[in-house]
């Protein structure tokens, strides 16, 4: 059975890594970043719910008087 020749593997792997690095650098360099990022204003509008207008009391079964 012939022996597998691995002498060119290191060159192949290194060239593949270099190519991937260059491709990713080119892809990232085309992305436009905002020059002056500013925080978004997080203002929320308070909505009135119908149950906020009236007072309600919730009785739990354990707090009811014994009968």
Swiss-Prot record:
BP GO annotations: proton motive force-driven ATP synthesis
Name the UniProt record assigns to this protein: ATP synthase F(0) complex subunit 8
Listed transmembrane segments: 8-24
Subunit comment: Component of the ATP synthase complex composed at least of ATP5F1A/subunit alpha, ATP5F1B/subunit beta, ATP5MC1/subunit c (homooctomer), MT-ATP6/subunit a, MT-ATP8/subunit 8, ATP5ME/subunit e, ATP5MF/subunit f, ATP5MG/subunit g, ATP5MK/subunit k, ATP5MJ/subunit j, ATP5F1C/subunit gamma, ATP5F1D/subunit delta, ATP5F1E/subunit epsilon, ATP5PF/subunit F6, ATP5PB/subunit b, ATP5PD/subunit d, ATP5PO/subunit OSCP.
GO function terms (MF aspect): proton transmembrane transporter activity
GO CC, one annotated term: mitochondrial membrane
Taxonomy of the source species: Eukaryota, Metazoa, Chordata, Craniata, Vertebrata
N6-acetyllysine modified-residue sites: 54, 57
Residue positions where N6-succinyllysine is found in the record: 54
Membrane topology: Single-pass membrane protein
Top-level taxon of origin: Eukaryota
Function description: Subunit 8, of the mitochondrial membrane ATP synthase complex (F(1)F(0) ATP synthase or Complex V) that produces ATP from ADP in the presence of a proton gradient across the membrane which is generated by electron transport complexes of the respiratory chain. ATP synthase complex consist of a soluble F(1) head domain - the catalytic core - and a membrane F(1) domain - the membrane proton channel. These two domains are linked by a central stalk rotating inside the F(1) region and a stationary peripheral stalk.
Keywords, ordered alphabetically: Acetylation, ATP synthesis, CF(0), Hydrogen ion transport, Ion transport, Membrane, Mitochondrion, Transmembrane, Transmembrane helix, Transport
Family: Belongs to the ATPase protein 8 family.
Localization of this protein: Mitochondrion membrane
